[in-house]
Design a protein with these regions (language model features):
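Non-catalytic accessory regions of SAM-dependent methyltransferases
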Residues: 1-49
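Short, solvent-exposed loop/helix junctions and linker helices
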Residues: 3, 7, 26, 50-54, ...
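Charged catalytic carboxylate motif
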Residues: 8-12, 28, 56, 96-99, ...
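Amphipathic alpha-helical regulatory segments at dimerization interfaces
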Residues: 15-19, 63, 159-162
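Short coil/turn residues that cap or connect secondary-structure elements
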Residues: 17-24, 65, 112, 179
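Non-catalytic, surface-exposed connector residues within folded enzymatic/regulatory domains
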Residues: 23-27, 51, 73, 94, ...
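Conserved AdoMet
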Residues: 31-107
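Conserved SAM/SAH cofactor-binding pocket of Class I
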Residues: 99-184
Length: 184
């Protein structure tokens, strides 16, 4: 097969994910198609998939049908206005994470209005999603992110570079250690 019509690829993916019991079939198929075709939205999808795109879609649908989290299949996750990398072994952002980030951003904004500046510390930062959202959305806020484990810390470093959150101070340390908390 040299090219695969988009509507056929979409139907095939829907059937496979539905048969696997995936609940969010339409959203997952849309994300997998965008990922396989390197498209920024469904409106940028080609009318036909190349052989390479088709193979990538087949592989991704196969992994997702095995219940591998969509974000680990595609290697990306969306958080507020950010597109972050995702890897197995590091927590995936959830809707509740966005609510928490929103609260931190609002509180940092209130402190900035009162004092002129704020400091936010994100302990056990994982991918860095909360820290980067706060740094990019809350002006005059100093952000520190602490992560003990090597893989999440490496991911947070990559994500910081990816989203341009250079104001975030990343620290590889134990969040429960007194020296970390007092920054000595």
């Amino acid at each position: 097969m040299s090219e695969w019509p988009l509507n056929e690829a979409r139907s095939w993916a829907r059937e496979r994910l539905s048969a696997a019991g995936i609940e969010s079939v339409d959203a997952d198929v849309r994300e997998l198609l965008e990922w396989a075709c390197d498209a920024s939205s469904q409106w940028d999808l080609p009318t036909e998939l190349t052989e390479e795109q088709a193979e990538k879609l087949r592989s991704g649908v196969g992994e997702r049908a095995l219940r591998i989290p969509l974000q680990h299949v595609t290697g990306r996750m969306f958080f507020r206005s950010l597109t972050l990398q995702s890897v197995p072994g590091v927590f995936i952002v959830r809707p509740e994470t966005e609510l928490l980030a929103g609260l931190a951003i609002d509180e940092a904004g209130a402190i900035v209005r009162e004092r002129g500046e704020a400091r936010v510390v994100d302990l056990c930062t994982g991918s860095g999603a909360i820290a980067f959202a706060v740094a990019l959305e809350a002006a005059s806020t100093e952000v520190w992110a602490v992560e003990k484990e090597a893989d999440p810390f490496a991911l947070a470093c990559r994500n910081r570079d990816l989203v341009g959150a250079c104001r975030v101070h990343l620290e590889r340390a134990d969040a429960t250690a007194l020296t970390t908390l007092t920054h000595q």
